Amino acid sequence: MASLGQILFWSIISIIIILAGAIALIIGFGISGRHSITVTTVASAGNIGEDGILSCTFEPDIKLSDIVIQWLKEGVLGLVHEFKEGKDELSEQDEMFRGRTAVFADQVIVGNASLRLKNVQLTDAGTYKCYIITSKGKGNANLEYKTGAFSMPEVNVDYNASSETLRCEAPRWFPQPTVVWASQVDQGANFSEVSNTSFELNSENVTMKVVSVLYNVTINNTYSCMIENDIAKATGDIKVTESEIKRRSHLQLLNSKASLCVSSFFAISWALLPLSPYLMLK
């Protein structure tokens, strides 16, 4: 027959087992309630020396205090950026990103975790991860960030040339782009034998100025100077008539993966100028 002490001992053990089981169930229900949330990134490119955006969105959560945003970069030990409890937490930020990052704090509650990166450097290129925790769950997504230099070209009539000539200039490109001329009238024509392109290294010894000259230009025609590398494609158009010159330019950021959204901008500016009286175009 069991003694009173043994009965008490086994009773306590039973209670402990029951409590442990209850705690395990509570934890289990808590974990099961936190599901994976959708996090979406958009591949993008940064222009050296300017500010860039690494785009990331997630399922909105009205509980700002529960939202944690972490940006990480492959090959970097420290964090790129962290936002938690409604403010930046930069104690573990890697040195290479100090003073250069920020999230859009007023837009976090609506699901915007995009990162602003100041003064983009070549070394900022790489694979980034946007990691999100909310009261609804957690999730992450990677993005490829390319860095280089790109700028809008401008095409002008070269009044100093001895023949009918167009001059296309763009101040900053990297890596070295290709330059191709095209004509609306002579579609498909190869202008490589009547054009000359040069690249001049800028003062920071990274980016280069692009200058391309097209000879034997004819009147009442639209010419396009197309500059392209693996990051961006820019086009400068010029239309020369008997009475005026019209210009247009646009630039689009390219993406190595067509399935992802293209980060781009399109700017058009027309300039209407009187044709020089001494410019004689055939």
From Swiss-Prot:
Q: In which tissues is it expressed?
A: Overexpressed in breast, ovarian, endometrial, renal cell (RCC) and non-small-cell lung cancers (NSCLC). Expressed on activated T- and B-cells, monocytes and dendritic cells, but not expressed in most normal tissues (at protein level). Widely expressed, including in kidney, liver, lung, ovary, placenta, spleen and testis.
Q: Which regions face the Extracellular side of the membrane?
A: 25-259
For biological process, the GO terms are: adaptive immune response; negative regulation of apoptotic process; negative regulation of T cell activation; negative regulation of T cell proliferation; positive regulation of interleukin-2 production; positive regulation of T cell proliferation; regulation of cytokine production; response to protozoan
Q: Which GO terms describe its molecular function?
A: signaling receptor binding
UniProt PTM comment: N-glycosylated.
Occurrences of domain Ig-like V-type (ranges): 35-146, 153-241
Q: What does this protein do?
A: Negatively regulates T-cell-mediated immune response by inhibiting T-cell activation, proliferation, cytokine production and development of cytotoxicity. When expressed on the cell surface of tumor macrophages, plays an important role, together with regulatory T-cells (Treg), in the suppression of tumor-associated antigen-specific T-cell immunity. Involved in promoting epithelial cell transformation.
Q: What is this protein called?
A: V-set domain-containing T-cell activation inhibitor 1
Q: Which gene specifies this protein's sequence?
A: VTCN1
